[in-house]
Amino acid sequence: MEWEAVIGLEVHVQLATKSKIFSGAATTFGAEPNTQACAVDLAMPGMLPVMNEEAVRMAVMFGLAIGAEINTRSVFDRKNYFYPDLPKGYQISQLDHPTVKQGKLDIQLENGEKKTITVTRAHLEEDAGKSLHEDFHGMTGIDLNRAGTPLLEIVSEPELRSAKEAVAYLRKLHSIVTYLGISDGDMSQGSMRCDCNVSVRPKGQKEFGVRTEIKNVNSFRFVEKAIQGEIERQIDLIEEGGKVTQETRLYDADKDNTRSMRSKEFANDYRYFPDPDLLPIEIDDAYIEAVRSTLPELPEQKLARFCSEYGLSDYDAGVLASSRAQADYFEAATKIVGDAKLTANWIMGELAKRLNQNSLDISQSPVTAEGLGKLLLRLKDNTINGKAAKDVLEAMWNGEGEADEIIEKKGLIAVTDDSAIEAFVDEVLANNAAQVEQYKAADEAKRGKMIGFFVGQTMKISKGKANPQQVNEILAKKLS
């Protein structure tokens, strides 16, 4: 039997406000435990929440970015449950009246086609604290620094059909929230966490299967592995005659599998009711338009501009526009060197290779955009050749200085004088008379391969300083 996966994601995005959603406590990541929790966060008697307008503005920004409807009246509710890191015994969230209603988001599939995914809603809520297990023997510590940090929970319709589609959707969300500046999107720090709802059904069947929810997956790679593993687990279970249980599961990255955490709750288990301490949020058209006027250029708009303004291919523009930091880096470097294609090739090639090897984002690159631009300027004006440029980039990466300084110190200035290069070529041809005869006797197809030998020997004699293009031109004349 052929099976089909049905996947929906609930993504919790930590908003980049300076203070918490209902208190004035700071939201800085990495502070000492319980140093950023005030009386409101600790649920001390008599403390009342005060709405952070900046969180509302950020939610509206996101809604406008995905073409969603902004609810003119949204209501906060109490979601009641007990957990040690939830001091009040309830979480303030939004149930029936979220700030953002239905929107759309386009993702690109592996085959190059686009697919539109419906975003059901995006609602504001407060984050819980954090349980600490490592430093306590036989006990659990509670850190309430995170309690009350504003979250935007973004819920998709179950329209995703594979683990890879889910990751494409998540990456697109990540791109949007970071472009907007409403979140840093750092999944390693919990700024973006994903709950994955997964079920399977026979292909062609309209009814949904029994779903499981995989909680708090915190990387793109783990989302793909967790969903794919859960799809396979459910199919194996059904084909062996078993039944899928509606439950919450956790992904174990070390064992690369999911394990049962608890039976899945329903909304009525939380006894939602409107929070009497918070008035409904009223959002009028003037406010919405004021927020709309602050929207930055979004990923798809930037991609289109990169194609039209810089003449980049859709693929190159898509890669460079995938993150705001990378797009800004590209434009800053291009402004210096004046060659968009050259800049794109080096960012996506030599620089990306080093970033990936060191698990760094481009914003953490030891080589600045200005530094790369100045290096490529020397490559473009033939001060150095391609091989030397790679050596200079490596030295810059290792903190040895700026491009011009390294070029001078290492003596990498290219030889571009025709007579000097011709002398190198003459020496190579004189030392390889047999190969010259073989070349002249060969057909055009073989000559194309053999010319590389002479180029290589010339570069060797010139200690890599000869301009390869000039070497090729002079060799072609002398061997014709």
Swiss-Prot record:
Record's catalysed reaction(s): L-glutamyl-tRNA(Gln) + L-glutamine + ATP + H2O = L-glutaminyl-tRNA(Gln) + L-glutamate + ADP + phosphate + H(+); L-aspartyl-tRNA(Asn) + L-glutamine + ATP + H2O = L-asparaginyl-tRNA(Asn) + L-glutamate + ADP + phosphate + 2 H(+)
Record carries keyword Nucleotide-binding: yes
Entry-linked InterPro entries: Asn/Gln-tRNA_amidoTrfase_suB/E, Asn/Gln-tRNA_Trfase_suB/E_cat, Asn/Gln_amidotransferase, Asn/Gln_tRNA_amidoTrase-B-like, GatB, GatB_C_1, GatB_Yqey_C_2, Gln-tRNA_amidoTrfase_suB_CS
The entry's keywords: ATP-binding, Ligase, Nucleotide-binding, Protein biosynthesis
Any GO molecular function: ATP binding
Entry-linked Pfam families: GatB_N, GatB_Yqey
Enzyme Commission code: 6.3.5.-
GO terms for biological process, alphabetical: glutaminyl-tRNAGln biosynthesis via transamidation; translation
KW Ligase (keyword) present: yes
Signal peptide (residue range): none
Similarity comment: Belongs to the GatB/GatE family. GatB subfamily.
Subunit composition and interactions: Heterotrimer of A, B and C subunits.
Function in brief: Allows the formation of correctly charged Asn-tRNA(Asn) or Gln-tRNA(Gln) through the transamidation of misacylated Asp-tRNA(Asn) or Glu-tRNA(Gln) in organisms which lack either or both of asparaginyl-tRNA or glutaminyl-tRNA synthetases. The reaction takes place in the presence of glutamine and ATP through an activated phospho-Asp-tRNA(Asn) or phospho-Glu-tRNA(Gln).
Protein name: Aspartyl/glutamyl-tRNA(Asn/Gln) amidotransferase subunit B
